[in-house]
Regions:
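A short alpha-helical cap/connector motif
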Residues: 1-150, 154-170, 180-226
């Protein structure tokens, strides 16, 4: 119940930030209108919805957020995703379903059999239990920095961000999970937004999106996605 009241309060606070009002950048307006607020029912939503019940006891986002991540991948078409903090595995599965050519590496400090079964025989998803720092460094030693990074269900978000930030490219999109989860994380999110090394950022409350195209004017977009 507390979460419902908190969301209602934040929805009111973000009321004027709905539907791209006041956004003058054509690319940002397109992203808000046709990715964030897109309502068309994608083909994969129904089978993915059926898989949710079996892993909802593990850390996860609302279904609305997982569908957003699906649309982000569908729009940007990244070739690779690195996810840190697998949680229920639902977000990785949604994003993998949006691009059949994208390879996914998802790292967690705990291995869950139900998550492994959720991924099933999908050869494009690699699910790895590891110390996160070691797993990230090993990944980067074998691969270029991926086009899409998801810092998800992990208490080590600061360390993960600091490890990956020097490796990002102008095409990289970084998804920050639950930037308002704690007072400490909220303050850190403000620092990420203000950091001169980051570019355009989007605050959707449940997730933050960070882009690194330095040819763009640095701006911060608050979007009412509650």
């Amino acid at each position: 119940m507390t979460d419902i009241f908190r969301r209602a309060w934040n929805w009111c606070c973000r009321f004027r930030h709905r539907c791209g009002y006041g956004v003058h950048s054509p690319s940002d307006f397109h992203f808000i209108t046709f990715v964030i607020y897109e309502r068309l029912p994608f083909y994969a939503y129904t089978p993915l919805h059926r898989l949710r019940r079996g892993v909802l006891h593990l850390p996860h986002y609302r279904e609305k957020v997982d569908r957003l991540l699906f649309r982000v991948v569908n729009e940007r078409r990244p070739s690779a995703l690195l996810e840190v903090g697998t949680g229920s595995g639902l977000s990785a599965l949604y994003m993998a379903s949006a691009n059949q050519q994208m390879k996914v590496r998802t790292l967690d400090q705990k291995y869950q059999e139900k998550v492994a079964r959720l991924f099933g025989e999908n050869s494009r998803i690699t699910y790895e239990k590891c110390e996160l720092k070691d797993g990230i460094e090993h990944f980067l030693s074998e691969n270029h920095c991926p086009d899409l990074i998801h810092i998800a269900h992990t208490p080590c978000y600061k360390e993960v961000f600091d490890l990956l930030l020097p490796k990002v490219k102008s095409e990289t999109c970084m998804i920050i999970g639950q930037p308002y989860a704690t007072a400490e994380k909220k303050q850190w999110w403000k620092e990420v937004v203000a950091d001169e090394r980051t570019g355009v950022t989007f605050d959707l409350y449940d997730v933050g999106l960070v882009f690194f195209d330095k040819s763009r004017v640095k701006e911060h977009r608050i979007v009412n996605f509650l």
